């Protein structure tokens, strides 16, 4: 079992990012970017405190930059994290996470 899980919205975010990247820069770049996200997920799972706290957005949430995006996550239990959303850095975080 992976030490991280993605919410339905995070999976949708990742799918949208993959589609946009593939259309804009091609499959090879899409694969590189998705691999970088996967590596970040594992890094966060192994070091959950590495991300910056963002309690102003939601209590218990942390954020971690990945390319042009920001991964929002929270620790669940002692050895797992939940990826909440993956948002472009230009998005209105309060609006997107307030859903």
Sequence positions of predicted segments:
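Generic alpha-helical structural context detector
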Residues: 19, 39-42, 85
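Short proline/glycine- and basic residue-enriched helix-capping loop/turn segments at helix->loop/beta transitions
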Residues: 45-46
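Enriched for short, Lys/Arg-rich terminal
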Residues: 74-99
């Amino acid at each position: 079992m992976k030490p991280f899980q993605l919410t339905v919205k995070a999976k949708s975010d990742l799918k949208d990012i993959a589609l946009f990247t593939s259309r804009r820069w091609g499959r090879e770049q899409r694969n590189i970017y998705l691999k970088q996200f996967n590596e970040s997920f594992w890094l966060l799972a192994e070091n959950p405190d590495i991300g910056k706290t963002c309690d102003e957005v939601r209590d218990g949430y942390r954020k971690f930059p990945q390319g042009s995006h920001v991964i929002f996550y929270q620790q669940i239990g002692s050895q797992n994290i939940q990826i909440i959303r993956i948002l472009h850095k230009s998005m209105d975080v309060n609006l997107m996470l307030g859903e």
